[in-house]
Amino acid sequence: MAENRCLIRLNRHTLAVTIIFKKQCADYGPRLTMQGSKHGSDGAQYAFPTWRKCLILTDACFVVFTSSSALCSMFPATAQIAAELSTTVETLHIANACVQIAMGISLFVWQPIRSFIGRRNAYLLAILTLFCFSIGAALAINASMFIAMRIIVGITGTFLLVAGQELLAETFDPVARGAAFGYMQIGNTTGLTIGPCIGGIIVSFTRWRIIYWLQVGLAGLGLILSSLFIPNEKGKSETVHGSISRLAALNPVNLLKPLVYPNIVITGSERCPEIQHILTSKQDIACGFLVFFQFIVLTSIPHIINPRFHFTTPLVSGLFYLAPGGGFVLGSLVGGIVSDRTTKRYIAKRNGIRLPQDRLNGSLPMWLGFMPVSMVIYGWTLDLEVGGMAVPIISVFFAAGGIVVAFNGLNTYTAEALPEHRFAAISGKYIIQYGFGAVSTAAVVPLIDAIGVGLVFTICAIISVIGGVGVFLVAKYGLQMQNHRFSSRV
């Protein structure tokens, strides 16, 4: 095959890149496209009217809210559950960590299911699983049964997030995609915070099992809405055929391939896997840091807030979740706007050329400013017992908002950088992400008991700065990283 040349000339406001693919790329097929392209649709499959897009977005947000609330709604009821099921609070904390580990590795289960029956059918099956095993959790007669039901419920959550992000990335144009992801993030984060509030209210007036019966109702409604509004994939076959294709679909390495490469800047077509599977491990680790922060805040609230302010009921400590919840909601709204505006600004600077990592620049103030400062204030005001209740509430509000603003750019970046392999790219992110979440969920309470809440959140602030530096390097020098890696592969 004759050599292919892709040349983008950028001087003061643009970027000079020359990529030459020689005959060695012939084995991967004749077509190669650049992700740094004009800012039109980058592989969007759907041309739905606005009202249909709104229905798809609403359903995706509601389903994500349902699955995330299933993860956290029992936090205020942990002591009551432990007492009724004859176990310990520590055992349930470890079980919560196991749920997050299951969430991370669950994509190895859902990826072949999705390949065999299609994304829409797999999506509906995941919601049905959430529905059925929430019933099992509500009817649990001992701790073992309850933990098993919790883990199976958790297995569905990550796939619903991944499939939802993949669907929104195909439905919305790049310049509106950040806002769509922001609304979906609202569903996720409000589930993580409103869920514990609802759980605290329920367990204060009735039995903890009602939490799961409410979950059953939400999952049933989500199943009905998804059956009506979630479309099939268009433009490509959803299922695999033939023995070789079926074996390939069962290969777990497909989800790990993207983690090999240092960065995404230029992606190839579906016939050039060496270039398609270029995912930033730095970005995945950054997402892991954010989930680490998120669950340190959420898991530790009953442990540090109750003794600090002498709360004695789950109702009051559950209401404290409204502070980070408000930050999550505001951050989701602001994050989408910041992400899209940053993308538009860089498109204008390059005369219409869009690179996926541009939107990461919008989250740098969160990494290097809002999050570390807020975490230090939150941790030390609780540790030193100063500032009353107002300062921790305000500081955790801003810390939570910063987490979600940073999340928006990273999530959107992952989903749009590999348009032909979105599922694998997003899945790799969640494998790492929930590994960090499991560590924070299991370790935060013993760590606070050992070194104090002030030092714990100081460590989080330091990690935030390190993560911010990594995101800055990806946003600023991602192209050079990609060119170096690509040259070594070709």
From Swiss-Prot:
Q: Known SUPFAM superfamilies for this protein?
A: MFS general substrate transporter
Annotated S-S bridges: none
- The transmembrane residues are 55-75, 93-113, 127-147, 151-171, 186-206, 210-230, 285-305, 318-338, 362-382, 387-407, 434-454, 455-475
Say yes or no: keyword Transport present.
Answer: yes
What is one term from the GO cellular component aspect held by the record?
plasma membrane
For molecular function, the Gene Ontology terms on record are: transmembrane transporter activity
Q: Where in the cell is it found?
A: Membrane
Glycoprotein is among the record's keywords:
yes
How does this protein sit in the membrane? Multi-pass membrane protein
For this UniProt record, give its keywords in alphabetical order, as a comma-separated list: Glycoprotein, Membrane, Transmembrane, Transmembrane helix, Transport
Q: Enumerate the glycosylated residues.
A: N361
Superkingdom of origin organism = Eukaryota
Looking up InterPro entries in the UniProt record yields: MFS, MFS_dom, MFS_trans_sf
Q: Which family does it belong to?
A: Belongs to the major facilitator superfamily. CAR1 family.
The role this protein plays is: MFS-type transporter; part of the gene cluster that mediates the biosynthesis of 2,4'-dihydroxy-3'-methoxypropiophenone.
According to UniProt, the name of this protein is MFS-type transporter ppsE
The protein's organism comes out as Aspergillus oryzae (strain ATCC 42149 / RIB 40)
Encoding gene per record:
ppsE
